[in-house]
Amino acid sequence: MTHILFAVLVLALLALAFGIILGFAAVKFHVEADPIVDQLDALLPQTQCGQCGYPGCKPYAEALANGDQINKCVPGGDATMRKIADLMGVEPQPLGGAEAAAPIKKVAFIHEDQCIGCTKCIQACPVDAIVGATKAMHTVIADECTGCDLCVDPCPTDCIEMIPVPTTVDNWKWDLANVAIPVKIVE
C-alpha cells in the first residue's frame, strides 16, 4: 500500500513541477499576436483550401494585414470580401482580381458509377462536404461544398467534376445595377 501512495505522490510532484515549468515558459516566451490578424482570420471561412495562394486562412489573414488584396478568398465570396473591406477601411473589389468578373460558383459532383470508394476525396475535403465509406460510393453535400477543387486531384478514377451551381430561387440574384427603372415625374 505504501508503494502505491509513494508512486502517486511522486507522480503528483512531477506533474506539479512540469506545470510550473510550462507556466513559466508560457509567460517567458509569450508572443504578442497582431489583433487585426485575429479579426481578419475570424472573418475568413476557415476552409484552408489555398485558392487565395496561401496555405490556409491564417497566412492569408497575415498577408491581408500587410496590405495584400482583399479579393482572393473565393469560398468566402463577396460577403466575406465586403466584411474585410469594412474592417480594413478600403473599397470593395471584384472577386478574384480587378480585371476578373465574379467567378461562377461551382460544386463538386461525383460520378457514382465510377467511384471505387477509396476515401481520398473525403480526406482532402476541408469542410467535410463529401460523405461515404470505404469501398462504398461517395456523394457530395452540395449545400456544404465551397467549390475549392481540392477533392478533384486526389481521385484516382477522375470521377469528380466541378459543375456550376444551378440557378434556383434560393441563390438567384437580380442584377439591379443594369436595370432601368422608369420614373414618372409628377408636377
Curated annotation (Swiss-Prot):
Its Enzyme Commission number(s) read 7.-.-.-
What would be one Gene Ontology cellular-component term for the protein?
plasma membrane
Q: Which domain of life is it from?
A: Bacteria
The 4Fe-4S domain is annotated at 32-90
Outline the segment boundaries, as ranges, of region: Hydrophobic: 1-26
Q: 4Fe-4S ferredoxin-type domain spans which residues?
A: 106-135, 136-165
Q: Where in the cell is it found?
A: Cell inner membrane
Q: Which InterPro entries match?
A: 4Fe-4S_dom, 4Fe4S_Fe-S-bd, 4Fe4S_Fe_S_CS, Elect_transpt_cplx_RnfB/RsxB, RnfB/RsxB_Proteobac, RnfB_subfamily
Write out the residues that bind [4Fe-4S] cluster 1: C49, C52, C57, C73
Functionally, this protein is described as follows: Part of a membrane-bound complex that couples electron transfer with translocation of ions across the membrane.
- Record PANTHER family: ION-TRANSLOCATING OXIDOREDUCTASE COMPLEX SUBUNIT B, OXIDOREDUCTASE
Regarding protein family, the annotation reads: Belongs to the 4Fe4S bacterial-type ferredoxin family. RnfB subfamily.
Name of the molecule in the record? Ion-translocating oxidoreductase complex subunit B
